[in-house]
């Protein structure tokens, strides 16, 4: 239902809010997977070019996580939105592409497979984003 009826509208709204926020601040973070868009040829480059027109720079943060860690976190989260995914894990996971996308300028890799990797990636992310200014 979500994929067919809500997703595209939700993502359009997220992008509109982000563009509006850029009018008031120089840094805007969007926390959405964009898993389809990140692999659509030209989508990220077109977005990058659109943002450059308003003086903004696109940085894509790709969160890496082991598949089993994802499953365990869904179990621990105990959310209704994960019920189908967990009950149909093999079918669900076949649809997810965990490989790092190719050809994206300003791609920051964030490893979230363990507490240690998360802390290290967080420190690196803070340094990375501070250096963009």
Give names to the regions the model predicted:
Residues 50-56, 79-84:
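Arginine/glycine-rich "motif VI" loop of SF2 helicases in the C-terminal RecA-like domain
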Residues 34-35, 64-69, 114-115:
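Conserved nucleotide-binding/hydrolysis micro-motifs of P-loop NTPases
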Residues 76-123, 129-133:
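Small-molecule kinase domains that catalyze NTP-dependent phosphoryl transfer to phosphate-bearing small molecules
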Residues 28, 58, 107:
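Hydrophobic anchor at the start of a short beta-strand
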Residues 6-54:
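Glycine-rich phosphate-binding loop used to anchor ATP phosphates in small-molecule kinases
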Residues 31-32, 61-64, 109-111:
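Conserved beta-strand segments of the P-loop GTPase G domain that flank and frequently precede/overlap
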Residues 1:
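P-loop NTPase switch/communication element
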Residues 52-74:
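Conserved phosphate-donor/acceptor-positioning beta-strand/loop module used by diverse small-molecule
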């Amino acid at each position: 239902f979500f994929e067919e009826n809500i997703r595209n509208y939700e993502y359009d709204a997220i992008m509109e809010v982000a563009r509006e926020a850029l009018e008031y601040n120089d840094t805007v973070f969007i926390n959405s997977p964009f898993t389809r868009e990140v692999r659509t040829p030209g989508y990220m480059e077109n977005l990058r070019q659109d943002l450059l027109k308003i003086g903004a720079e696109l940085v894509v943060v790709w969160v890496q996580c082991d598949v089993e860690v994802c499953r365990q976190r869904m179990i621990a989260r105990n959310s209704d939105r994960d019920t189908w995914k967990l009950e149909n894990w093999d079918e669900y996971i076949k649809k997810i592409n965990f490989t790092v996308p190719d050809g994206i300028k300003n791609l920051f890799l964030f490893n979230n497979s363990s507490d240690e990797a998360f802390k290290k990636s967080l420190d690196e992310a803070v340094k990375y984003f501070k250096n963009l200014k």
